[in-house]
Each structure stands twice: as C-alpha cells, then as structure tokens.
C-alpha cells in the first residue's frame, strides 16, 4: 500500500496577537502590550498593510489551494474585529481567536484550526505585513511534496523550505525605497515547514535565523520570492540589509 503523503498548505499570521513572548515587546506587561498593539494609529496602518499588500499577493497565487489563519487575541477591541469582514472577499482567510499564550502553543492551535482533518502533513508558512511571489504556494507545494517523497520529511522529522531572495521596500525612504537582496539564511517570510499534522513543531518553533541549525532545510537563493516591508510599526526587530553597491 502506498504511503499517505497528503499535504495541506496553511499560513498562520499573528495579527496584532497579544500573546506571551515571541516579539521584541515580550517583556512588556500585558496591559502595556495591549495598549501598544491596539493603538488606533498602529491598527489603521496594520490594516492598510494587510489589505493592500499581504492579502492581494495571496489572492494572486497561481495555486489557490491553501488556508490563511489570522490569529487574534480575545482581548482585541470589537472595532478591530472587522478583520472578519475580509473573509467574504478572500475565501482562503479564516480568523482564529485565542486567549494569550506563548508563540508555539498559540500557533500550534491556530495551525490545527486550519487543518482539513484528513491531510497527513501540514506545510505551514508565515506572512505578516509583506507579500510573496504569485507562484510561492505552487513552488512551496512542489518542493514539499518532493521532500516527503524523498523521506526528508516524515512523521517524526520536519523539514524547512526557505526562499532567501526578495525585494526590500523601505517605506521610510523616498530616494531608494526598493532593492533586491539575497539573505544568507532563512527569513520568517517565504519560509515554510513540513510537519506531521499532530507534530508539536511548526515554522514558529525556532527563530528563523536558527531554523537551519535545527531542521533539515531546503534553500533557494536565486528566485525572487517576496517583498519585505520595512516600516515603523513592526515589532520583530527588522533590520535593513545593505544597499547594493
């Protein structure tokens, strides 16, 4: 009997999720974290980036067989829960509401929420205020399926897929806002992880800079696969890579 290598692609986006740890604000008191995350000006920009950059790039995918889980906290003010209104024009989008929890626990539950209940494996990726290439899902699926066939990923062994090259968009620069750059290792953006559907691990398990030190990793530094935004409201300590000489 042929082995079951069925594989579902699921993205989890922590949408201003007031959880415990995982970002630069991890040391803040919960009330201060929520005040920062739900600041009206910050939330308005968050929605603009999500609606104008992230969602359109996913809607343009050549392979539409995927699920996007927007993870929000149960403390999010009601006015910002209009996020759920976006589920109608974007059928791949689901909203998952959870209490505050650590990054691995919360994202594991969010991935389970997006699971179709029959695929044996989940290829989970992450996206935030950014865009991925229109063929990102198709290419990620093709690589993931090959990794499963080769045994690089199985029930007990996860494997990562990382595309390193993309376009950086510095929203604070008018002179040279865009440039192409290839990272030396995996980013959180345009990286995915193939795991068993009941695995304790997922793409949030390790800092993206440490994924290749902990998981078998397939890398592609050649294809331009993302647009990464650089702005003032992201809380992931994003750094600006060197401009081309």
Describe each model-derived feature in a short phrase.
Residues 2-6, 12, 184-245:
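C-terminal catalytic/acceptor-binding lobe
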Residues 8-13, 57-58, 66-71:
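Hydrophobic targeting segments
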Residues 17-45:
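A solvent-exposed, charged loop/short amphipathic helix patch at secondary-structure junctions
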Residues 35, 53-65, 89-90:
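Short, acidic, metal-binding catalytic loop of nucleotide-sugar glycosyltransferases
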Residues 42, 72-80:
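A conserved acidic beta->alpha catalytic loop
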Residues 65-75, 97-99:
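Short beta-strand/loop segment that forms part of the nucleotide-sugar
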Residues 102-118, 132-217:
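Conserved catalytic core of nucleotide-sugar-dependent glycosyltransferases
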Residues 119-123:
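Short acidic donor-binding loop at the edge of a beta-strand
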